[in-house]
Amino acid sequence: WVDRLIELGALYMWYHTYRPMGPEASPELALSPEEQLRIRKFVVEMRVKKPIGIIDAYYDADGKALCPAATGFTHHISPWGDIEPCPIVQFARESIYDERPLADTFNNSQFLTDFRQLAASHTRGCIVLERPDLLHELTVLHGAKDTTARNTASAELQSMTLRPSQYNPA
């Protein structure tokens, strides 16, 4: 697949791993810690062997696990314009339709700021998978709205089983 992308002229590619979220999550499809390590090694090896930029969304330049949303590196805009911390955190306080410029929203949103601090202080991985309880508390504290069309994200978060993410301190 990497070679095919190079043949097609792609200059870079992103690796994302499945996050079992939503009303019909399939946790059996999520990678085990061993499988995640195997993918991570593959990405690192391909970076030095292939003439294409390879971005692993869940690791920093030093190879340490991270949550891109906890760094402020990424946000997600829902189809309705809601500004979410990441694609699987489907809660928001702000919208692209708010009066202030986007840069102000990204930099001054108390919800986004508190999300970053919460995620960074509890894991280098995915807070949704590792600590959905804390994420639920944060959404309640801020009165963040469910940005899904099904309006079940809060219940889904509360019923989640803890799962490993990309952070593996062992």
Where are these regions (language model features)?
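Flexible mid-to-C-terminal extensions adjoining Fe-S/redox cofactors in radical SAM and related proteins
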Residues: 88-170
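Radical SAM enzyme [4Fe-4S]-AdoMet core and its adjacent flexible, acidic
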Residues: 1-66, 70, 79-80, 84, ...
